[in-house]
Amino acid sequence: MAAKKLTHLDEKGAARMVDVSSKPVTSRSATAKGRVTMQPATLKLIAEDGLKKGNALEVARLAGIMAAKRTADLIPLCHPLAITKVEVDLKMDKKAGTVEVEATVKVAGQTGVEMEALTAVSVTCLTLYDMAKAVDRGMTIGDIRLTRKTGGKSGDYKAK
């Protein structure tokens, strides 16, 4: 099997934005997940909307949606895309002291939305941290990963 080549580097190793102009417009989607782990008392405050900064879950959800739309401004070689859907779900696990974040992004375009889904999850997690850091600076953010993608030349992907 031939080694895969990095598409964002030219033959001299210089960074470049990939030319997708000859690719067909297809329906594409990507889903990513991540987690914020915190003290049970912090999660209780979030669940009861008891933080001074406001409703942490809804602010974080909106931040994730906004981040997906701004991915090309944050990651230098990402294409700006006309995203057709961003959905951010947050699930609290009181026993584990976690908020699980899942983002799904869709587009009809010439390139995928994996980075947009990952960015949405990352910024959602960061926003949860920001909203609750006054009561719990020991929170951790982790396990951010792509879990699924559909469409495009490389085909579908589902994490194991």
Swiss-Prot record:
InterPro entries according to UniProt: MoaC (IPR023045), MoaC_bact/euk (IPR047594), MoaC_sf (IPR036522), MoCo_biosynth_MoaA/MoaC (IPR050105), Mopterin_CF_biosynth-C_dom (IPR002820)
GO biological-process terms attached to the record: Mo-molybdopterin cofactor biosynthetic process
Entry superkingdom: Bacteria
Protein's UniProt keywords contain Lyase: yes
Chain positions recorded as substrate binding sites: 77-79, 115-116
Reaction(s) this enzyme catalyzes, per UniProt: (8S)-3',8-cyclo-7,8-dihydroguanosine 5'-triphosphate = cyclic pyranopterin phosphate + diphosphate
Family the UniProt entry places it in: Belongs to the MoaC family.
The keyword Hydrolase appears for this protein: no
Recorded name of the encoding gene: moaC
Subunit structure: Homohexamer; trimer of dimers.
Active site: 130
Pfam families: MoaC (PF01967)
Protein name from the UniProt record: Cyclic pyranopterin monophosphate synthase
Class of enzymatic activity (EC top level): lyase
Annotated keywords: Lyase, Molybdenum cofactor biosynthesis
Pathway connected to this protein: Cofactor biosynthesis; molybdopterin biosynthesis
The enzyme's E.C. designation: 4.6.1.17
GO terms assigned for molecular function: cyclic pyranopterin monophosphate synthase activity
Role summary: Catalyzes the conversion of (8S)-3',8-cyclo-7,8-dihydroguanosine 5'-triphosphate to cyclic pyranopterin monophosphate (cPMP).
